């Protein structure tokens, strides 16, 4: 891609083709700065009548542990603000890991089951973090893992503190993430 706008448009083209070819597809979605332009393009095409999200299911890549869906730093909030509130997707078919579940193993197991019940992910949108992380999976992480908890590295905390009032507000020590499409 020539630049961010071109990359965003190309990614949106791939996603829209998936939705058109399989209206009841399962999209794996990402958060952060990488996909924002893609979501803006998808919203624009939806508003023009070119896309219909009514049968789409989504599963998000990750979530901070300890943040409620209403917290403006949660990835559920991010997805609502940057995509779901602007298209005709059925929010009961949009899934983000449960950041409020106290039992991390239970939260991971439940999210894995949600993904399995959807039949896996048809298309996964990913973004790359400043150090090459995908989701909260740092470089060198095993890609065959299902949903699991990870400790945020200091470099990821440093990069993500810009989204919070202070570095101390960045949720620790773990966050939920998955890469495997089941």
Task: Give residue spans per PLM region.
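A glycine- and small-aliphatic-rich helix-loop capping segment at beta-alpha/alpha-beta transitions
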Residues: 41-52, 75-77, 139-148
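Generic structural signal for well-ordered alpha-helical scaffold segments
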Residues: 12-20, 43, 47, 80-84, ...
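Ligand-binding beta-strand-loop-alpha-helix segment within the catalytic cores
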Residues: 51-123
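Conserved small/polar residues in nucleotide/adenosyl-binding loops
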Residues: 177-182
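Short glycine-rich anion-binding loops that position phosphate/pyrophosphate groups of nucleotides
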Residues: 33-34, 64, 128-133, 139
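N-terminal glycine-/serine-/threonine-rich phosphate-binding loop
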Residues: 1-27
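Glycine-rich N-terminal segment of FAD-binding domains in flavoprotein oxidoreductases
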Residues: 21-47
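Class I SAM-dependent methyltransferase SAM-binding "motif I" and its flanking Rossmann-like core
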Residues: 131, 135-176
């Amino acid at each position: 891609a020539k630049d961010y706008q071109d990359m965003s448009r190309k990614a949106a083209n791939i996603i829209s083709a998936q939705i058109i070819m399989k209206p009841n597809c399962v999209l794996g979605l990402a958060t952060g700065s990488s996909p924002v332009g893609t979501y803006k393009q998808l919203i624009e095409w939806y508003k023009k009548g070119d896309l219909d999200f009514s049968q789409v299911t989504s599963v998000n890549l990750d979530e901070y542990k300890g943040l409620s869906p209403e917290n403006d730093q949660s990835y559920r909030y991010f997805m609502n603000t940057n995509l779901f509130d602007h298209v005709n997707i059925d929010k009961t078919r949009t899934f983000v890991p449960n950041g409020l579940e106290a039992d991390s193993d239970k939260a991971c197991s439940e999210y894995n089951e949600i993904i399995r019940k959807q039949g896996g992910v048809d298309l996964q949108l990913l973004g790359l973090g400043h150090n090459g992380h995908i989701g909260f999976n740092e470089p060198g992480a095993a890609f065959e893992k299902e949903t699991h908890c990870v400790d945020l590295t200091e470099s990821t905390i440093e990069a993500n503190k810009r989204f919070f009032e202070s570095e101390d507000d960045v949720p620790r020590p773990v966050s939920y993430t998955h890469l495997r499409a089941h």
